[in-house]
Amino acid sequence: MNHYPEDPLRILAVAETWQGSNAYAFVRSFRRAGHSVSLLADEWFAASGWQSRPMKAARRLLWPMILREATDAAQREAKQFRPHLFFVFKGIMVSPQAIRAVQAGGGIAINFWPDTSFVDHGKTAAQALPCYDWIFTTKTFGPADLQARFGITNASFLPHGFDPETHKPTAMDRSDATLYGCDASFIGTWSPKKEKLLVALMSALPSLNLKIWGSQWERAGPSLRAYIQRRPIFGAEYAKAIGAAKVNIAILFEGNANAVSGDRLTSRSFHIPASGGFMLHERSDEIAAHFAEDRDCAMFGNPEELADKVRFFLAHDEARNRIAQEGRSRALSSGYSIDDRARTVIDKARALLAARQETVAPSVASTFQLAPSEQASVGPPAASDT
């Protein structure tokens, strides 16, 4: 029996809420589609801004209490809001008890896991993974890794996407052009591989106007310090930086010791072309499956090719601009937006709810009927969109 194939769902979502967050993009997409979303924001329980050593130490000491607060809040919302879907983006503070509270009321729990490793983000997240009704992973190797590590088979690959509200060509004034304009940019968190490639690029093209945006670049050696902007950029500023750079370099994260593979596709793979930027992407079979080389983006496979491609496209404005336009068209026409990804999540939730409804008693199934007056989200006042 179909489970309300057209009716909006009640969704309890765990996500960060800063503008430009991949997690918050899902929340806004669900709301645009007419679903009722109650939000449990990660930052309500553990402030990510606590970056100094004393504050990090305090957070470690408080962590058991933070987890208890997060679990209590989820259990409370499960009882009061009665969600059809518990949507968790990563969920480092989501416990098995929180998931079971939703499932006990007949709801479905779905996780969207964006990282290469399932075991490097705390014990709570790893313990919770087997409890979900379904896991979407942005890595093609993710389902096999979940089965090998946890015996989980209810998982599938779902790539990142672009947020149509954020990742789009964005108007800039002169100060924006001064701040973000450059020959080439890299936007992303530091890693040894990324540093090595950018050092090689600057050795080959020492006069290149390069700008590096992102976190942890203070760990880089002295040869890149002149190019590091010493801060991450988010939301509209991120889109501006993409649009202002002549060449946007997309380097894949190599993964860490506990990951079975490094990235083959990332969120930036979609953000850059959707924002109207020219993308020079590290070559992989997965990026090639989404964007055609030399039509929708350019690609490189080693430091020498990276330098050669940067040099070539800086000298060929027409080719660079044509590829940027084709890349945006490809992103818009190929189902790469967060709205498309969110529809996949909703379709899976409906299928799981329908399967569950066939096995539950009518008295339990009836708790899912949406009253006509149920329009607003249930939750703390801070959950409202601004």
Q: Where is each model-derived feature located?
A:
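Active-site proximal beta-strand in glycosyltransferases
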Residues: 101-116, 134
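Short hydrophobic patches on amphipathic alpha-helices
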Residues: 78-79, 129, 242, 310
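Conserved acidic donor-binding segment of nucleotide-sugar-dependent glycosyltransferases
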Residues: 297-303, 313-317
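C-terminal alpha-helical cap of glycosyltransferases
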Residues: 338-386
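Nucleotide-sugar donor-binding catalytic core of glycosyltransferases
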Residues: 2-56, 67-73, 89-90, 96, ...
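Proline-aspartate-enriched helix->loop->beta-strand connector
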Residues: 78-86
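A charged, aromatic-enriched C-terminal amphipathic alpha-helix characteristic of glycosyltransferases
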Residues: 315-347
